[in-house]
A protein has these predicted regions:
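C-terminal motif of bacterial Sec signal peptides marking the signal peptidase cleavage site
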Residues: 41-43
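Gly/Ser/Thr/Pro-enriched helix-cap/hinge segments flanking short amphipathic alpha-helices
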Residues: 45-50, 58, 62-65, 435-440, ...
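Blade-edge beta-strand/turn elements of extracellular beta-propeller
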Residues: 66-69, 132-141, 182-192, 261-273, ...
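Repeat-based blade/solenoid architectures
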Residues: 75-94, 140-152, 191-202, 244, ...
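Beta-propeller blade termini
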Residues: 85, 91-102, 126, 147-162, ...
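Hydrophobic beta-strand segments that make up the repeating blades of beta-propeller
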Residues: 105-112, 159-168, 214-218, 291, ...
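Short, conserved, GDST-rich strand-edge loop motifs in beta-rich repeat architectures
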Residues: 111-119, 218-243, 410-434
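Asp-box/WD-like beta-propeller blade repeats and closely related beta-sheet repeat scaffolds
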Residues: 139-152, 167-206, 220-241, 245-247, ...
């Protein structure tokens, strides 16, 4: 099985301011995990750096949900960025999980800030048969040296191999997967090169023609000569209010034939997206109004969020305020950054979580009826957490497989902290240590309410980092969702799911043979088990600058099997598939189920 298999307003990026498991089966890895835990608590080689805003020191652990296996994994990546208060320096550090060579094992792609004063290139890590990761960046063509932000994975030409889109300050890059571990950058040839500041991105089949289209959220119209200061007159990072908003962009995939050179056409103007510019840091592309056509939600930094509803004719209409997604529970715009989307209360409707600044409450938009949302953070339990960070990457995943999605979130400040005494993680650039905060973990109690269990999980929440990206995927193939975090000015962290006494589970891959066998991004599934209907959406590009494993992880709790799976494919067709026993990974292929009535 291999090594890993056994092993309110505020400042900064946010709102305007005045200055314009399973136990390890092999003893060596178990010993390594125990040693890492001892080092964490004894402070082996870990200095304490000042940062009062990092969050409370976790209590001694009981049964933990994660083990930090970064060292054992073989992934060696440290994000480097500038230290001169240039605004793009505090935005990036994306992570993408993908199986680029289709060998059945997840690989990891890490985005670097190659032009932010520190140099460096993006890195691609291949998972070997023994479960360790090997750096295969050199010679792959994927080792870009731009001012990187995030990355998403998806098969743009229906050849069965996932490609990569990388967003940068001043560019959108397209890495076409040629096979054999080789990528070619073809953004200009494909028609998606763009000089704006691209941050989030997502694939979407907005016209339901079987080809993945591309949405890119641009941030601000950045002027690098603009200098900003804090309330004390010290130079500081500019807030987005210092610059003009920009338009989210959409490109239609017009490749048309498998094996043809990938081609896109810019549909931004005709789609209507330019009528509502914004300051996008997060995206969710999903059918949010229940008509079977994918829509576009933009989490906007310091402004009202935008929701573009698909009009089924190639155009979109902005309806965020109408549907309850524009403002927070106080009726105000907030520092909207990271996103997570899942059915948290079991009513069959997706709920939307959006992260904010430390001094703001995060938003938990519960979908009360199809297409209408209410910020219900007060009754979600998330507002009751003992401590609140400046949130970026966030994921809903059923980490303990009890049938209810839990929430993981990484945090990192956007303005310097008041000096204090809390430990900052190894490898964090000392200049960035004052922006470090702990990650948080929340358990779903089975009613859609969440309980903060961060203090009992120091392997995930015990050290302060400048958290940005957070990607979820089953790295070791044991059916349990693992986590990979990307940290500004610091190292990537790999966290293996070791939840004791996990429930039963089902992992689904939804693929379309007519589209080269690629993952059916945008598909929805309902797993019927034990009298419950577990709804899930296949959309890897949520969180913050991240791309998750393109699979659905369904916790079944005590149910040893499932009765049926109902799939709504991106083109609007619906199929029903027979059930089976739990604790299995299953591939469902479009066209092989029983046709269901829409």
């Amino acid at each position: 099985m291999g090594l890993i298999r056994h092993m309110a307003t505020g400042d900064g990026i946010g709102t305007p301011r005045s200055s314009v498991a399973r136990p390890c089966a092999r003893a060596p890895l178990a010993s390594l995990i125990l040693l890492c835990a001892v080092c964490m608590w004894c402070g082996c080689g870990r200095p304490s750096r000042p940062d009062a805003a990092a969050g409370p020191v976790p209590k001694p652990p009981g049964p933990q949900w994660f083990a930090d296996i970064t060292e054992a994994s073989g992934i060696r990546f440290t994000h480097r960025t500038g230290t001169n208060y240039d605004m793009p320096d505090q935005v990036g550090s994306g992570i993408a999980l993908l199986d680029f060579d289709q060998d059945g094992r997840l690989d990891v792609y890490c985005v670097q800030d190659g032009r932010g004063g520190a140099g460096g290139r993006n890195q691609l890590f291949h998972q070997e048969a023994d479960g360790r990761f090997r750096d295969v960046s050199a010679g792959s063509g994927a080792d870009l040296a731009g001012r990187g932000m995030g990355a998403i994975a998806g098969d743009i030409d229906n050849d069965g191999l996932p490609d990569l889109v990388v967003t940068e300050h001043g560019a959108v890059r397209l890495l076409h997967n040629l096979g054999g571990g080789r990528f070619e950058e073809i953004a200009a040839e494909a028609g998606i090169d763009d000089p704006r500041w691209a941050v989030p991105a997502s694939f979407i089949d907005f016209d339901r023609d079987g080809w993945l289209d591309l949405v890119v959220g641009n941030y601000v119209d950045h002027d690098p000569t603009q200098i900003c200061h804090d309330a004390q007159g010290r130079q500081d990072f500019c807030a987005p209010a210092a610059f003009a908003p920009t338009s989210t962009r959409i490109w239609r995939n017009v490749t048309g034939r498998r094996g043809a050179p990938p081609r896109f056409e810019d549909r931004t103007e005709v789609s209507g997206l330019t009528r509502a510019p914004g300051v996008a840091l997060g995206l969710v592309c999903a059918d949010l109004d229940g008509d079977g056509w994918p829509d576009i939600f933009c989490a906007d930094d310091g402004r009202a969020n935008r929701l573009f509803i698909n009009q089924r004719d190639g155009t979109f209409r902005e309806e965020a305020a109408l549907r309850g997604l524009a403002f927070n529970a106080m009726g105000r715009p907030a520092a909207n950054m990271g996103t997570a989307f899942a059915d948290c209360d079991g009513d069959g409707l997706g709920d939307l979580f959006v992260t904010h600044l430390t001094e703001e409450f995060h938003s938990f938009f519960r979908q009360d009826q199809r297409g209408l949302f209410t910020d219900s953070v007060a009754r979600s339990g998330l507002q009751d957490a003992g401590w609140r960070g400046t949130g970026f990457g966030a994921v809903f995943a059923d980490l303990d497989a009890d049938g209810w999605p839990d929430l993981a979130q990484v945090n990192g400040l956007v303005r310097r902290a008041t000096p204090g005494q809390t430990p900052v993680g190894d490898g964090v650039d000392p200049w960035w240590a004052r922006y470090a905060q702990r990650a948080q973990l929340f358990a779903n109690d089975g009613t859609g309410r969440f309980r903060d269990i961060s203090a009992a999980n120091p392997a995930f929440s015990g050290e302060a980092l400048v958290g940005r990206s957070l990607a979820v995927g089953d790295l070791d193939g044991d059916g349990a969702p693992d986590l990979v975090t990307g940290n500004l000015g610091g190292p990537v962290r790999v966290h293996r799911n070791v939840v004791p006494a996990r429930g039963h589970w089902l992992k689904l891959r939804l693929v379309d043979p007519a589209a080269g066998g690629r993952d059916a991004i945008g598909a929805e599934a309902v797993v019927v088990a034990g009298g419950r209907r577990h709804w899930a959406l296949l959309q890897p590009a949520t969180s913050y600058l991240s791309s998750h494993e393109p699979a659905l992880h369904i916790g079944l709790g005590k149910d040893p099997g499932y009765a049926t799976v109902e799939v709504s494919w991106p083109d609007g067709t619906k199929e029903r598939f027979a059930g089976g026993t739990a604790d299995a990974s299953v591939v469902l292929r479009k066209g092989t189920g029983t046709r269901a009535t829409p």
